[in-house]
């Protein structure tokens, strides 16, 4: 679908449809008031008859309104004017896209980007409209033999901005929004792919294809089990021992900073392409969803695509730590003691706490890049789901400024994270009688002790950990990957590049 911005009066629009807002209780938005005046009170008369109350998501499609050049006007409820926030704004945009498609509109001019959203500027409103539109149109049917094409006639959407001087900001918002949306889609597609297709080798092939597509800035190298063994990545290797699929770590390097020697931002994604729990076998119910245990790696891949698409003036390294945790005669066991790449030893108490074993070696590996910061992304703990539910990701960090940056980016992007504490007292729960540490710390504070484990491998750089176990996918009827936290990390990198949309 094509997006563009313009600045014009609603009465001058010759379009298949104009989209304007109505507030509760039956209050016209400023643009709707202009149309009402031109139509000699036609719209307000309909509202007085109770045709539309203005609740969030309510719609009323008007045909051939008197004195209006456009064929139709779509009125959409926006709730109470002073309470229109980011979440409601996105709900309104999503409803708009679905309604336009349902009603057969091929193109439309949307004036919702002129609504006042608390604390948000035109750039934010246009960009969120683009990202939300793409989200509303997403489907995953690659593996269906009988593809039913949904009715999506909408081909062009024009966002109106209040003044001509905001056109540049709006155009930039579309560019950024499309790149972020493409990154989200890439992450969702990877996450939704079944584990018999999407194994570590598949992740590696996608990483190589990304380098082929953006060869000017991106190089990819893939580290196999033999090289991991030579590097001493024994914890990572142990997790994949029970699987017939080789563990592979894909390292994607993007160089966009004019200073080629500038220290990179490093993103590390947990890529366990299927997690049975290993010898500590998971319950059978909903085990199919353990294909989503690679959503951390999928999100890093999506972010790297966004970075390359926008040609950001940064150096960024993305690591996809791919493997599969299966039971078998060669699988690692509870009671094993592993020597990590860092030289520290770990007693395995539960083979289903495997993500931290993969990450600890990957986090040691990335020391060689002399990183400015390192951010790992992982569907790491069920404890984080219990703590924060399915709406907000967990954030833990050894560096306050980095944590504050990420929280700020999460608020900007509408991809929220919440910082959890990581006090030294929690480290005591990881004590082992037989090794430097255990790989679990018991049930209390499980998301925190998992991060405390990782913190022992990140002492040489500023680091943050995003636990997306509750936010990376949805269960139930709407089952599927969400693409989070691509939007959060994209915003973080846009901010670092000085492209945060502030006018």
Curated annotation (Swiss-Prot):
Presumably involved in the processing and regular turnover of intracellular proteins. Catalyzes the removal of unsubstituted N-terminal amino acids from various peptides. It catalyses: Release of an N-terminal amino acid, Xaa-|-Yaa-, in which Xaa is preferably Leu, but may be other amino acids including Pro although not Arg or Lys, and Yaa may be Pro. Amino acid amides and methyl esters are also readily hydrolyzed, but rates on arylamides are exceedingly low; Release of an N-terminal amino acid, preferentially leucine, but not glutamic or aspartic acids. Belongs to the peptidase M17 family. Its main location: cytoplasm. The keyword Manganese applies. NCBIfam families: PRK00913.1-1, PRK00913.1-2, PRK00913.1-4. HAMAP family: Cytosol_peptidase_M17. It comes from Erwinia tasmaniensis (strain DSM 17950 / CFBP 7177 / CIP 109463 / NCPPB 4357 / Et1/99). Signal peptide: none annotated. Mn(2+) 1 binds at residues 275, 352, 354. Binds 2 manganese ions per subunit. Its cofactor is Mn(2+). One of its GO terms (biological process) is proteolysis. This is Probable cytosol aminopeptidase. Keywords: Aminopeptidase, Cytoplasm, Hydrolase, Manganese, Metal-binding, Protease. Its EC number is 3.4.11.1, 3.4.11.10. InterPro entries: Leucine_aapep/pepB, Macro_dom-like, Peptidase_M17_C, Peptidase_M17_leu_NH2_pept, Peptidase_M17_N. The active site is at residues 282, 356. It is found in: Cytoplasm. GO terms for molecular function: manganese ion binding; metalloaminopeptidase activity. Mn(2+) 2 binds at residues 270, 275, 293, 354. GO terms for cellular component: cytoplasm.
């Amino acid at each position: 679908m094509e997006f563009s911005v313009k600045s014009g009066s609603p009465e001058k629009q010759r379009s298949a449809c104009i989209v304007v807002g109505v507030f509760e209780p039956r209050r016209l938005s400023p643009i709707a008031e202009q149309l009402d005046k031109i139509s000699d009170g036609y719209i307000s008369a309909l509202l007085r008859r109770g045709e539309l109350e203005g609740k969030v998501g309510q719609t009323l499609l008007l045909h051939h309104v008197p004195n209006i050049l456009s064929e139709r006007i779509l009125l959409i409820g926006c709730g109470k004017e002073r309470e229109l926030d980011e979440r409601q704004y996105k709900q309104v945009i999503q409803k708009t896209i679905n309604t336009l498609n349902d009603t057969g509109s091929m193109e439309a001019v949307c004036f919702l980007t002129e609504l006042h959203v608390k604390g948000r500027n035109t750039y934010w409103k246009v960009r969120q409209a683009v990202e939300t539109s793409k989200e509303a149109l997403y489907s995953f049917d690659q593996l269906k033999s009988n593809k039913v094409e949904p009715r999506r006639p909408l081909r062009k959407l024009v966002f109106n901005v209040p003044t001509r001087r905001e056109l540049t900001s709006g155009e930039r918002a579309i560019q950024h929004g499309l790149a972020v949306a493409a990154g989200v889609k890439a992450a969702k597609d990877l996450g939704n792919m079944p584990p018999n297709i999407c194994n570590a080798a598949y992740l590696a092939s996608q990483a190589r294809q990304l380098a082929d597509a953006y060869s000017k800035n991106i190089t990819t190298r893939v580290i196999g089990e033999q090289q991991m063994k030579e590097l001493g990545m024994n914890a990572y290797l142990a997790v994949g021992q029970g699987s017939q699929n080789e563990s592979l770590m894909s390292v994607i390097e993007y160089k966009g900073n004019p200073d080629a020697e500038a220290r990179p931002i490093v993103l590390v994604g947990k890529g366990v392409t299927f997690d049975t729990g290993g010898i500590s076998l998971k319950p059978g119910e909903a085990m199919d969803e353990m294909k989503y245990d690679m959503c951390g790696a999928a999100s890093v891949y999506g972010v790297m695509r966004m970075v390359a698409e926008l040609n950001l003036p940064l150096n960024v390294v993305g690591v996809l730590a791919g493997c599969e945790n299966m039971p078998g005669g060669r699988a690692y066991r509870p009671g094993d003691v592993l020597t990590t790449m860092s030289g520290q030893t770990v007693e395995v108490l539960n083979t289903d706490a495997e993500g931290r074993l993969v990450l600890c070696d990957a986090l040691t590996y990335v020391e060689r890049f002399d990183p400015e910061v390192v951010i790992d992304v992982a569907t790491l703990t069920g404890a984080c789901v219990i703590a924060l539910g399915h709406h907000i990701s967990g954030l833990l960090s050894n560096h306050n400024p980095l944590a504050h940056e990420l929280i700020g980016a999460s608020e900007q992007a509408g991809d929220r994270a919440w910082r959890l504490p990581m006090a030294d007292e929690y480290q005591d729960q990881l004590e082992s009688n037989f090794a430097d540490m255990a790989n679990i710390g018991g049930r209390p504070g499980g998301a925190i002790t998992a991060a405390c484990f990782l913190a022992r491998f990140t002492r040489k750089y500023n680091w943050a950990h995003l636990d997306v176990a509750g936010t990376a996918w949805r269960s139930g009827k709407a089952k599927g990957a969400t693409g989070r936290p691509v939007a959060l990390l994209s915003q973080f990198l846009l901010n670092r590049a000085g492209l945060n949309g502030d006018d």
